[in-house]
Amino acid sequence: MAATRALPAGLGELEVLAVGTVLLMEALSGISLNGLTIFSFCKTPDLRTPSNLLVLSLALADTGISLNALVAAVSSLLRRWPHGSEGCQVHGFQGFATALASICGSAAVAWGRYHHYCTRRQLAWDTAIPLVLFVWMSSAFWASLPLMGWGHYDYEPVGTCCTLDYSRGDRNFISFLFTMAFFNFLVPLFITHTSYRFMEQKFSRSGHLPVNTTLPGRMLLLGWGPYALLYLYAAIADVSFISPKLQMVPALIAKTMPTINAINYALHREMVCRGTWQCLSPQKSKKDRTQ
């Protein structure tokens, strides 16, 4: 079990403060944008559709990632982990579960868009709700396995936040890593890529794509790919040769995904923007309804 400890060698207080500042900016940005998305969905009846339920689920997952980053930011600014061993396990579980829900949620949105635009059938509630439940139950299941001994949660290199421990590189870690990564990274990445690929093929003749078909897959790969590469390296080599500062880069990149997802999947869409504006301008919205 993890225990409270001092800063690791090779990291000064100023560098930990810099990490904490970056995490704080990422956390506040993700919470604000995804919170606005969730608020607009809850307050605007036009947005309460099965397809938008998938986007709402993604926003909830990304809010969870941002809340996890906020805890890490505060701990980094304190330059210590103040929540003890059990707090580390909870922090690791919550961060891992919401990260998996975000990755799989992105794939669910991609499949939902393919279903909507390529099958000429509206996504039904009796399909969207089980899909969202599956995403969250699957993510919670995989995140709970390290608590039961398959994998392990421990401190990240700065020692002020917790994640899946990759420093051991033993058989237990390797077996969990490759199994988990196949079902929770490679499969969602494949679903995302093929869904948007089929959409490109369907709309290639008209030349008009209803959504951006290249950005979601690239962002999924660029946002979570560095983490995957770090874990892969840890499985085949001694990760201690990589400096703690460099090991923190994938985590900082991944924490930008809530902001990117909020902009890409929700806030740039005309209907969501209109719903958000109605929520922020209640007097104007009331006036419009009375006319």
UniProtKB/Swiss-Prot annotation:
UniProt-recorded name of the protein: RPE-retinal G protein-coupled receptor
PTM annotation: Covalently binds all-trans- and 11-cis-retinal.
Keyword set, alphabetical order: Chromophore, Disulfide bond, G-protein coupled receptor, Membrane, Photoreceptor protein, Receptor, Retinal protein, Sensory transduction, Transducer, Transmembrane, Transmembrane helix, Vision
One GO term describing the cellular component: plasma membrane
Residues with the N6-(retinylidene)lysine modification: 255
Entry keyword Transmembrane: yes
Cytoplasmic face of the membrane: 37-52, 113-130, 197-219, 269-291
PROSITE patterns given in the database record: G_PROTEIN_RECEP_F1_2
Domain of life of the source: Eukaryota
Organism of derivation: Mus musculus
Main subcellular localisation: membrane
PANTHER family (alphabetical): OPSIN
Disulfide bridge positions per record: 88-162
